[in-house]
Amino acid sequence: AASDVYKRQIMDDPFYDDALVKSSFDDEGVPCKTKAVVEKGVFNGLLHSLKTAHYFHVAPTGNGFKMSTAGSISTEPTNLFIKEGNLSKDEIISTVEEGIYITEVNGLHAGLNPISGDFNVQSSGYMIKNGKIDKPITLFVTSGNFFEMMKNIEAIGNDIEKRFVGVASPTLKVKSLAISGK
C-alpha cells in the first residue's frame, strides 16, 4: 500500500558507498554525519549550516557547502536519497498499463517551491504502454506537490541512480502527477 511505502526513509549520507562524492567535513569544518531526514514517514528535521543552525538555535548538521570557490556558504545535502526498495525497474514498469517513465527533469532550481513543495519542471522520458517502455518523449512539463507525491508512491525500486552530485533516487512508481505538452 502507498502508506506502507511512505514509511520509507529519506537519508542524507555523506559516506554512502556508491556516492559520487563523499565528505567527512563540510566547507565550514563541521563533521558530516549520516542523517535520516524522514524516518518511518516522519520528518526529523532540517539540514543546517552554521548560519541556519544559529538562527534556529540547533546544532549544525555538517551541511554548509560552497557551490564554487568564490561563492558563499549555503545549506546543501551531501548525498540525499530515498532509501531503496526491493523491486527492479523492470518489475515496476511491468505494473504500469499506461504511463510515463521520467528519466530527466530540468529546472529544479527555479521550478520548485521549497516551502509549499509545489513543483513545475521540464521533463523527458518514455511512454509506458502495457507494462513496456514505448516511444521517447521530450519537452513536457511535470507538475505536482512533493509532499503529495511522497504520499502517492506505490512502489520503490532497488536501483538508486546517482546522476547528480548530492541527490539520488531509485525508480519510483507514483500514482499520478500532472503532465502537459505534446
For each predicted feature, which ranges?
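N-terminal small-residue-enriched
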Residues: 3-182
